[in-house]
């Protein structure tokens, strides 16, 4: 269901996504045409932040594109989970066997962010909002729809994230937008554990044609999941994401 002003989140619900890209202008062309996004510069970046643009759908924020400053870093989409206290959540991540990759650190007046890795190495973000609560729209074509963790050990993943985000995953009325599945269900068994960000599309086959025309690639052709029909693609710079028919 389409949702506007999606700003009230339980801790552990995905509230934002960004793509680390070597070429932001190319990213704007690709995603602007694929999803109908428009873009605006973020003008309160601090000295530690790379050039960043915010993507909008019908004038509401839906994602960000961030320029990579180190070519050794992956070109990747990252999902951020809402938290009211990034420092406390970072402590719980470490106590559960995960690691902090960066932060927590303040991101201008927008909030506090951090990057973490779970015990199997899958990287995810934390977002403690201030001026920027997260998605303004989701669950509609062109917006965030789901995040799937592909992992080698689903029982261990369920235990780790269940301890971190119990209310979001298992509490009354839980609607987490976040699932777990074995890597080998979709990808080669040797692929590292990772989160796959899903964007909703009205017509998956048409979207796949647009991806190919824009220089992207189909990584996994359409298949059925418990949450809908999915195809895995990558943009023209190599960042992978999924299209979810809805």
Functional labels for PLM-detected ranges:
Residues 1-9, 13-22, 52-55, 68-92, 96-149, 171-182, 186-187, ...:
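Vicinal oxygen chelate
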Residues 2-60, 95, 103-111, 149-179, ...:
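Core segments of cupin and vicinal oxygen chelate
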Residues 3, 37-74, 119, 123-130, ...:
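Conserved short beta-strand elements that form part of the metal-binding/catalytic scaffold
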Residues 27, 43, 47, 73, ...:
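Residues in flexible loops and secondary-structure boundaries
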Residues 29, 91, 119:
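Short alpha-helical basic/polar micro-motif
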Residues 139-144, 154-155, 164, 192:
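Short gly/pro-enriched beta-turn/loop segments at secondary-structure junctions
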